[in-house]
Amino acid sequence: LAFIALPGSAQQTVKEPSTEKSFPVTVTYTSGGTEYTMTVTGLTVRKKMFFKVYGIAHYQQDPVKGKLEDVIHAILTDGKAKQITMDFARDVDAEKIKGAYQDGFKENATAEEMKTLQPLVDQFTGYFTKEVKENQQFILRWLPGGVIVASVAGEEKPVITSPLFAKVLWSIWFGEKSIVDREELVEKLTN
C-alpha cells in the first residue's frame, strides 16, 4: 500500500475542496532500507478547461517554511524526499495522459535538456498504457539522488534516476509554467 499509518496514531487527513478528495497528512515510504516520512505541504486541483481532472497533494520530508520563492526553490532541489499524489476525479485515456506529460516536459526543459531527457521521458510516458479511471491514484516520489519512483493505479513502475529528470518532472507543478496553482501546493509552508 502507498500509505502507512504511523504506529499508535490514527491517520489524519486533509481534503482538497474542489474535488473533495481526501489525503493523509503524512505518508511514509521505504526504499533501500531507508524510511522516508513526508508531510503534506498543500493541496490543489488540476483543471483542464472547466473539468476537474484530479485532486493533488504534495508532500516533503522535513519541509521548511519561508517565502514562496525559497519554498519552491527547496522543492525543486534534490536532497529531500518528496511525493506528489494525484487522485483522479474523472476517467482520462492513456494518450491524453502521455501527451500531457510530454507537453509538461517540453514546457519546463530547454531544447538542450530535452535532448538528454527524451529517452527518460519516453520511458516514463510508457508507464501510462491504460485509461485511468475515476478514483485511481498516480503517486510520484522523488527520493534523494534524483530517484523517481512512479506508482500508477497501484502498480510500481521501474525507477528512473536522473536529478535533471526529477527537477523537470516536479516543475510541471512547481515551475514558472505550472499546470496548477502552485501556491496552493505549498500553502502550509508559506502561511
Predicted features by range, described:
Residues S151-E155:
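Short strand-turn-strand beta-turns centered on an Asx-Gly dipeptide
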Residues E156-R182:
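Flexible glycine-rich active-site/ligand-binding loops centered on an Asp-His dyad
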Residues E183-N191:
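Cysteine/selenocysteine-centered motifs that mediate thiol-based redox chemistry or coordinate metal-sulfur cofactors
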Residues T39, A57, T85-D87, V149:
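Soluble periplasmic/extracytoplasmic beta-strand elements of cell-envelope proteins
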Residues L1-A5:
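Bacterial N-terminal signal peptides
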Residues Q12-T77:
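N-terminal structural module
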